[in-house]
Every structure is written in structure tokens, then in C-alpha cells.
Amino acid sequence: MPRKVVFEGQIEHLQILDENGKVDPEIGVPEGLTNELLVEMYKEMLFFRRFDKKALALQRTGQLGTYASLIGQEAAQVGLGYAMNEKDWLVPSFRDQGLMMLRGVPGHKIITYWNGDERGSQYDEGVNCLPICVPVGSQLLHGAGL
């Protein structure tokens, strides 16, 4: 089979913070991103990590069923959660526990879900979140049209 070129171009790297945590002066800090908001978001990440560690401990001692850890996803979930509007819907994957809590799903519902109880997927009215989808990649199809 003859060879053919399938890509020509360049890939750019965007770095907002340098290695010392300083913001690039050309880019600057996004409007509305205050120190207070950053601290609030950081506290959310810490809470998600503590929640996750507790859930993992429960799972490893046989007190919780299958559980997919969110470790390493905290910042992405907080960033997305804070960027979403109140009317936006979340179609979570199996590692989106933090994002679900930001959207109004109580932590005990998430634990109930991972213990195999369908009541863990019943959320209060006004919580725009579908139940967790475990199959990888199915969220896009489920979210289409919401």
C-alpha cells in the first residue's frame, strides 16, 4: 500500500502559568477570576480528594461496591463545574463524582449508587444531572439533545 500524508501542520502549546506559578503577562488573569474564587475552587478540589479517599477506603474494606476514583481529575471537574450555567445538564461518566456534587448531587447519593442501589440515581428536582454512565464514551450520545 502506498504511503500518503494524513497530517501537515503544527501543534501549539499554550502555557498560562510558568514553572513558578506566575501568570504570563501577555495573557493575564481572566476577568472575574479573583483570589477569593481561586481559594474557593481549591477548597472544592481538596473536598473531592477527601471524599474520594474515603470512598476508596470503603471500597477496599468491602463496605462499598465498585468505585472509580476521581484522583487526578479534581481540577478539571472544578473548572468545568464553575464554567457550567445553572440550566446546563451534566451527563456524567464513572469518574465525575466531584462535578456531580458541584451540580447539586449529594455525596450520599453517589455512595448509594456505587453500592448498587438505584435510589442513588434519583436526584432532587432542579438538579440537572443524569445518572452515572459507566460505558466509556456513551455520555456524548446520552447528552445529545439535552
Describe the function of each predicted region.
Residues 32-43:
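Short, contiguous, helix-prone interaction/anchoring segments in small proteins
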Residues 10-14, 49, 115:
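N-proximal short alpha-helices
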Residues 37-38, 47, 75:
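Active-site-adjacent structural elements in enzyme catalytic domains
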Residues 7-10, 38-40, 83-85:
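A generic structural signal for short, non-catalytic loop/turn and secondary-structure boundary residues
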Residues 15-21, 43-56:
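N-terminal glycine-rich anion-binding loops that anchor highly charged ligand groups
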Residues 50-53, 57-146:
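Cofactor-binding active-site loop characterized by glycine-rich and histidine/acidic residues
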Residues 1-29:
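Charged, compositionally biased N-terminal leader segments and the immediate start
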